[in-house]
Design a protein with these regions (language model features):
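Alpha-helical transmembrane segments and their immediate juxtamembrane cytosolic regions
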Residues: 5-8, 14-388
Length: 388
């Protein structure tokens, strides 16, 4: 065992020396805690968003529906929807760059396929079909499938169970596309990204608006390949440079004020309209708010969120499980509350469903992550090797 470990160490050192002899940047082992914090906080925002979404009065398909005609809590959706997933793609682009500095392409493909593609394809038929079942129960879709054979119904439920996993499906596509881009550009573009000034970062709003107009799927509107692809590759080529984010952090107050102003305007002006479809989703004000929010969050968290404690470390470890599993207990509890406790006050319903989403996700994660094979299919987790 010692001989094996020594050989790995020797190979690592040879690779390190080889890279530096080529004049490449030395391997960066810096842990960027602020990115971990952005990720788990954003995941929590996504969960809260889905709790409110389940009872919203704007998008009525596939949800329980509103408690009354006008709901002020629906404003939360307008405040977070334009930027929350775009932010996750930006952070993902950054972390992909850091990963590739420590791993070769073969490891990258294997790791991303296992963690992203497997759960969002194989996992649908192993576990997420259960979510598809409740999605169809909530929407009343089973009434139209009474004569459909069981195997066909199972496939439909599996596809309906994609839910929040669309994010990792798209992320896998971007990750594989990045390999082709890297082969062509050979870090020439990436090196130029280090010099990006703050004023140019702000002007990238024009590109955000442009890319938000293209590569959007017509029916399932969450697949926005244009704007999410731009955020991912911008994260990789520009924001992965610590110098860029450091310069940006000096302007956090300005961007925070700009974000608050544009966010309030966007929410008030479009409140009541469907925020998840064109033209509300990709108009100029939505894109300005989206991009300035990303800049403000990166700047603020780099300045004040680059530390950790027991809670943040724990949340960072559990955020992946919370993201993958939260919608199932949320939908399940929401459905049975509608069936058996439909007269409960709105506040109580939100609390019960919200707690169920977080607690249920954590419970499912702890269970599934301990079951061999199933954890690989559903979470992309492999068995940890014990080192002696």
């Amino acid at each position: 065992m010692l001989r094996k470990g020594g050989r790995k160490t020797t190979l690592f050192m040879l690779k390190y020396v080889k890279n530096n002899c080529k004049g490449e940047k030395s391997m960066d082992n810096t842990r960027r805690v602020y990115l971990d914090n952005i990720r788990w906080i954003t995941v929590c925002i996504v969960v809260i968003y889905h709790v409110i979404y389940m009872y919203n009065g704007v998008q009525l398909f596939g949800v329980i529906g509103p408690f009354k005609e006008q709901q002020l809590q629906d404003a939360f959706q307008y405040l977070v929807y334009p930027w929350m997933m775009a932010l996750l793609y930006t952070v993902s682009g950054m972390t992909v760059r850091y990963y590739l500095e420590k791993h070769n392409l073969k490891e990258f493909i294997r790791d991303k396929t296992r963690k992203l593609l497997v759960p969002s394809t194989v996992g649908l038929f192993v576990f997420q079909w259960i979510l598809g079942y409740y999605n169809m129960k909530i929407s009343g879709a089973f009434e139209s499938f009474e004569s459909v054979p069981g195997i066909v119904r199972y496939v439909i439920m599996a596809i309906s169970g994609i839910g929040v996993l669309w994010y990792i499906q798209v992320l896998w596509i971007f990750s594989m596309l990045l390999l082709l881009v890297r082969k062509i550009e050979r870090d020439r573009i990436w090196k130029k990204g280090e010099k990006t000034p703050v004023w140019l970062l702000a002007l990238l709003t024009v590109f955000v608006y442009g890319f938000s107009q293209v590569l959007n799927t017509p029916v399932v509107t969450v697949y926005r390949f244009g704007i999410y692809g731009f955020c991912f590759f911008t994260g990789y080529f520009i924001f992965s440079h610590d110098e860029v984010v450091e310069r940006l952090s000096k302007w956090w107050v300005i961007f925070l004020i700009a974000t608050g102003t544009t966010g309030i305007f966007y929410t008030i002006y479009y409140f009541g309209e469907n925020y998840a479809v064109e033209p509300v989703l990709n108009n100029l004000s939505a894109c300005i708010y989206c991009w300035f929010s990303i800049l403000a969050i990166l700047a603020f968290m780099k300045k004040y969120g680059n530390s950790e404690n027991k809670v943040s470390r724990w949340m960072s470890k559990k955020s992946w499980g919370i993201y993958v599993f939260h919608y199932l207990p949320l939908a399940c509890v929401a459905y049975y509350l509608r069936c058996f406790a439909s007269e409960l006050p709105a506040g109580i319903v939100y609390i019960v469903v919200g707690i169920s989403a977080f607690a249920g996700a954590l419970l499912l994660y702890e269970i599934i992550s301990r079951i061999p094979i199933i954890r690989w299919c559903v979470l992309g987790l492999k068995k940890e090797r014990k080192h002696v």
